[in-house]
């Protein structure tokens, strides 16, 4: 990452991934540091895709949060801030966004999130997303994806909480794989994950490590090809 905030580069990376649905974190809307741009809208427009942005944080006219961009029509199911309990020096409001994509193979639920840095808040955030107001309300036979930057490695409690309800695509495709995505300068941590329910079967998983991806973000995209058990293929990713 070179310190520049370029929506065009992010869109170019997404286009090179051949993905159908992408979750994005740490996007700005109206913030001075990104020239007051609506980053989600600019990325989606360059791709010719649909999108929905949810601000986890607001300060005056400035907003900061997560988005889902999709080749397919998408419908907002839920978007909300999540509980936080981090120490003051790393406190930041976190959020999650839940869309239903109307794919060629049928409807698919996608939740994109960005967990906090504190141990307690990550545990609370994991419990929220697997609970009755989020994924717990989705029938088991409806394809569901939970993806994002969880700031949690595979040995952590938040990861294990989610793993008790959903399956990590990595564990199904290549259990021994490291899939380190952060930081792009020297990838040493696997904190980005794609979880799926039993209605989906991951067939491929990779870290999209390219020179442009290294410049576009401090995380490399994690890309997963999924098969809907009753129909066919879908590609999901994070950038």
Residue ranges of model-derived segments:
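Active-site environment of divalent metal-dependent phosphoester hydrolases
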Residues: 1, 29-35, 59-62, 118-121, ...
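N-terminal, active-site-proximal structural segment of metallo-dependent hydrolase catalytic domains
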Residues: 1-46, 51-53, 57-63, 106, ...
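Active-site neighborhood of phospho(di)ester-bond hydrolases with catalytic His/Asp-centered motifs
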Residues: 23-25, 52-55, 145-149, 168-170
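Active-site metal-binding loops of divalent metal-dependent hydrolases
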Residues: 27, 115, 149-150, 220
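Catalytic-core segment of enzymes that process non-peptidic bonds
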Residues: 49-85
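Beta-strand-turn-beta hairpins that frame and shape the catalytic cleft
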Residues: 62-64, 71-75, 91-112, 226-231
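Metal-dependent phosphoester-hydrolase catalytic domains
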Residues: 85, 100-103, 133-145, 151-239
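Active-site beta-loop-alpha substructure in enzyme catalytic cores
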Residues: 105-137, 141-145
């Amino acid at each position: 990452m070179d310190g520049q905030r370029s929506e065009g580069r992010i869109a170019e990376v997404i286009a090179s991934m051949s993905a159908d649905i992408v979750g994005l974190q740490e996007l700005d809307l109206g913030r001075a540091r990104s020239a007051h741009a609506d980053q989600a809208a600019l990325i989606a427009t360059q791709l010719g895709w649909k999108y929905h942005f949810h601000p986890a944080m607001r300060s005056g006219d400035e907003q900061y949060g997560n988005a889902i961009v999709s080749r397919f029509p998408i419908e907002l199911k839920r978007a909300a801030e999540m509980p936080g309990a981090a120490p003051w020096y790393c406190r930041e409001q976190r959020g999650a966004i839940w869309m239903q994509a109307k794919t060629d193979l049928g409807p698919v639920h996608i939740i994109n999130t960005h967990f906090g840095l504190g141990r307690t808040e990550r545990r609370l955030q994991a419990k929220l997303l697997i609970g009755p107001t989020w994924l717990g309300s989705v029938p088991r036979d409806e394809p569901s994806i939970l993806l994002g930057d969880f700031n949690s490695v595979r040995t952590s409690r938040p990861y294990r909480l989610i793993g008790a309800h959903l399956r990590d695509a990595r564990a199904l495709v290549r259990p021994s794989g490291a899939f380190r995505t952060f930081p792009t300068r020297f990838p040493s941590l696997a904190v980005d994950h794609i979880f799926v329910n039993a209605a989906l079967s991951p067939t491929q998983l990779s870290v999209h490590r390219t020179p442009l991806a290294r410049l576009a973000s401090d995380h490399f995209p994690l890309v997963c090809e999924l098969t809907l058990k009753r129909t066919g293929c879908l590609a999901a990713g994070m950038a």
